């Protein structure tokens, strides 16, 4: 539940037992346990529709209800809460929430009415209707796209494992270029659980969404939309159809589309037995290798690529995992993977880690279920200290040119001075407003007058400068002219 909340959802709906402080006897959410502090939606604020007893008991001067605490969270947790102020019966609860959702999705479309108007439209004078209140701004509209993409098609009509499908459509919300998101979901799963209670056996049946088979981004330059998806081997082979979900937006408008008639089937086997390529980058896109440095407060970018695509189904044993080898604990991060724009082979995970010394192992699977692992050790730099790390030049010795590479902890101005062994400065190179992290600088091996320098050993000094700090380092370079 918390993962779904923090990832972003439009509506949180609950019907069942509860109180002003918790949902369900099993403590699905518990205010006294501090669960509100674990909700981190950011600006992705959902509407809560909670059909349970007294969840929104706002007129109790002695204590605060869960609904009140949710709505008080600054830019977090909830945009509004619709819930009860008193105990409510099961039938009344069910009837009212059913009426509310019928008003929200009137005639199988999303209502354009303000939420306060929707709520008022189903107030029928019954006690159950009187118990439900809106905590929030009644003039707000539903956080669900009203517009739809049109003429959405996918070909072929049956998608086979390890093969690609092409989707097309028309958007009419913007005349400019933009981008959107696309997901392919496996068939819904019918679940039945049996419980033995006091020598009686009870069954509970429900439906869960199918596994995510693809999750990516696409771009468009006009009204037409098109892109590709790839199907993994790990499908359910259900007779039910799969779904394609699409979403686009600009600053003012958003639109969505669903195709829920896609058939999936087994495809041809592959001879590919190589797993994905795994690499690491900083937030500037610079590739990181063992013992490199990551700037303080920067996330680590984990890039994963494979010609057959990456397995995103989260099937047991086929998840994308990150193991913190310092703590010997693992996280399943499959849901954090997103394909690059217009790609069906390469994507990334934006991983937040604050360790001073980073030691991770990443494991991922391609769509043919070939695994790969990659381990890396990194050092975290201190943001308030200007330092230069890992200064090298290559080739060294050099003939006609060489390239200097180095890491700097903060944005900086650079000055490179090259000296003879006698202390004479023969060349200076300056660069300004360079970004923190890994940088390179080329030198053609000539002096300040563009003359070739003599064979021999030289010393260079690298200076990184900020307004208040200066850091420099001396290194030896050798020149060989034939």
Language model segments and positions:
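Catalytic-core segments of thiol-dependent peptidases
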Residues: 1-61
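Active-site-proximal C-terminal subdomain of hydrolase catalytic domains
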Residues: 51, 55-156
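Short, compositionally biased P/S/T/A/G/V-rich stretches that sit at domain boundaries
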Residues: 134-170, 265-298, 305, 381-397
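Beta-strand-rich binding/interaction modules
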Residues: 162-200, 314-317, 414-418
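Long, low-complexity serine/threonine/glycine- and acidic-rich segments characteristic of extracellular
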Residues: 183, 190-264, 282-285, 295, ...
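A structural signal for beta-strand boundary/capping segments at domain termini and interdomain linkers
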Residues: 255, 369-373, 425, 450-452, ...
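C-terminal tail/sorting-segment detector
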Residues: 377, 384, 451, 455-482
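Glycine-centered coil/turn sites that cap beta-strands in beta-rich domains
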Residues: 379-422, 428-432, 440-443, 464-471
């Amino acid at each position: 539940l918390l993962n779904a909340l923090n990832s972003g959802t439009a509506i949180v709906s609950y019907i069942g037992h509860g109180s002003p402080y918790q949902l369900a006897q099993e403590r699905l959410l518990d205010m006294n346990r501090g669960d509100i502090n674990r909700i981190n939606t950011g600006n992705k604020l959902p509407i809560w529709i909670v059909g349970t007893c007294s969840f929104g008991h706002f007129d109790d001067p002695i204590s605060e209800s869960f609904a009140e605490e949710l709505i008080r969270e600054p830019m977090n947790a909830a945009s509004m809460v619709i819930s009860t102020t008193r105990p409510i019966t099961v039938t009344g609860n069910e009837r009212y929430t059913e009426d509310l959702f019928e008003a929200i999705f009137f005639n199988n479309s999303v209502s354009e009415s303000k939420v306060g108007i929707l709520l008022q439209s189903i107030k029928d004078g019954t006690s159950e209707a009187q118990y439900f209140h809106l905590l929030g701004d009644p003039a707000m509209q539903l956080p669900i796209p009203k517009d739809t993409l049109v003429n959405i098609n996918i070909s072929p009509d049956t998608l086979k494992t390890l093969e690609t499908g092409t989707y097309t459509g028309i958007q009419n919300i913007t005349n400019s270029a933009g981008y959107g998101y696309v997901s392919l979901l496996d068939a819904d799963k019918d679940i039945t659980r049996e419980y033995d209670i006091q020598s009686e056996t009870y069954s509970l049946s429900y439906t869960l969404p199918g596994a995510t088979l693809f999750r990516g981004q696409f771009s468009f330059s006009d009204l037409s939309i098109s892109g590709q998806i790839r199907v993994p081997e790990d499908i359910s082979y259900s007779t039910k159809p799969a779904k394609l979900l699409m979403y686009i937006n600009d600053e003012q408008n958003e639109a969505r589309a669903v195709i829920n008639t896609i058939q999936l089937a087994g495809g041809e086997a592959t001879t590919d037995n190589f797993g994905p390529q795994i690499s690491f980058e900083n937030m500037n896109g610079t590739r990181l290798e063992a013992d490199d440095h990551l700037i303080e407060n920067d996330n680590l970018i984990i890039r994963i690529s494979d010609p057959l695509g990456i397995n995103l189904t989260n099937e047991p044993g086929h998840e994308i995992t990150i193991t913190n080898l310092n703590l010997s604990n693992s996280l399943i991060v499959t849901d954090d993977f997103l394909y690059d724009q217009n790609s069906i082979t390469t994507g990334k995970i934006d991983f937040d880690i604050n360790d001073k010394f980073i030691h991770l192992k990443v494991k991922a699977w391609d769509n043919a279920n070939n695994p790969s692992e990659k381990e890396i050790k990194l050092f975290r730099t201190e943001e308030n200290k200007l330092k230069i790390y890992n200064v090298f030049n290559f080739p060294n010795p050099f003939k006609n040119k060489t390239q200097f590479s180095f890491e700097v902890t903060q944005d900086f101005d650079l000055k490179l001075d090259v000296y003879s062994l006698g202390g004479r400065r023969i060349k200076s190179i300056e660069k300004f407003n360079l970004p923190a992290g890994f940088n390179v600088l080329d030198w053609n091996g000539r002096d300040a007058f563009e003359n070739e320098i003599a064979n021999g050993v030289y010393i260079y000094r690298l200076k990184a400068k900020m307004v208040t700090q200066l850091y420099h380092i001396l290194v030896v370079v050798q020149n060989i002219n034939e």
